[in-house]
Amino acid sequence: MNYYTTAETPLGELIIAEEEDRITRLFLSQEDWVDWKETVQNTEHKETPNLAEAKQQLQEYFAGERKTFSLPLSQKGTPFQQKVWQALERIPYGESRSYADIAAAVGSPKAVRAVGQANKRNDLPIFVPCHRVIGKNSALTGYAGSKTEIKAFLLNIERISYKEK
């Protein structure tokens, strides 16, 4: 069974999903949520303890009171994607890394584009902070598809400097 709840944030209403007692998705837009919900069976709006905690931690993050998340997270991906997502979780609050930095950190220094694709497939943005990955010249690059304004907002919360493309 999949459960979900909504969280009011400065970005608008975000939707958090849980499956098998693990947080599995954070939707930044209604469109993404609707697309997902149409493909998944057995989905119920219910605020489980994990979803309530995720919602609380998100609210603390947006209020500037939380620097790291401590939630039971799970997302499906290739072994390479899993390594990238783990590397993202190690980027400290208020710091950024380049795609090349992440590629090197996962032992594949030439896999810069693959790191970008793994970021794009991150189903847990904010919780797994792919917004902290910027271009090698501090350029603001893609986020959650084409949502660079969200990335800029998150970088500003954390006071991470970047350059507009």
UniProtKB/Swiss-Prot annotation:
GO biological process: DNA alkylation repair; methylation
Active site, per annotation: 130 (nucleophile)
Compartment(s) of residence: Cytoplasm
Reactions it catalyzes: a 6-O-methyl-2'-deoxyguanosine in DNA + L-cysteinyl-[protein] = S-methyl-L-cysteinyl-[protein] + a 2'-deoxyguanosine in DNA; a 4-O-methyl-thymidine in DNA + L-cysteinyl-[protein] = a thymidine in DNA + S-methyl-L-cysteinyl-[protein]
GO (cellular component) term, any one: cytoplasm
Keyword GTP-binding applies: no
Domain of life: Bacteria
Listed GO MF terms: methylated-DNA-[protein]-cysteine S-methyltransferase activity
Keywords: Cytoplasm, DNA damage, DNA repair, Methyltransferase, Transferase
Up-regulation conditions: Constitutively expressed.
InterPro entries hit by this protein: MethylDNA_cys_MeTrfase_AS, MethylDNA_cys_MeTrfase_DNA-bd, MethylDNA_cys_MeTrfase_DNAb, MethylG_MeTrfase_N, MGMT, MGMT_N_sf, WH-like_DNA-bd_sf
UniProt-listed Enzyme Commission number(s): 2.1.1.63
Gene3D superfamilies xrefs: Methylated DNA-protein cysteine methyltransferase domain, Winged helix-like DNA-binding domain superfamily/Winged helix DNA-binding domain
Function: Involved in the cellular defense against the biological effects of O6-methylguanine (O6-MeG) and O4-methylthymine (O4-MeT) in DNA. Repairs the methylated nucleobase in DNA by stoichiometrically transferring the methyl group to a cysteine residue in the enzyme. This is a suicide reaction: the enzyme is irreversibly inactivated.
Similarity remark: Belongs to the MGMT family.
Miscellaneous comment text of the record: Bacillus subtilis contains 2 species of O-6-methylguanine-DNA alkyltransferases. Ogt and adaB are regulated in different ways, constitutively and inducibly on adaptive treatment, respectively.
HAMAP family from the UniProt entry: OGT
Cited PANTHER family: METHYLATED-DNA--PROTEIN-CYSTEINE METHYLTRANSFERASE
Protein name: Methylated-DNA--protein-cysteine methyltransferase, constitutive
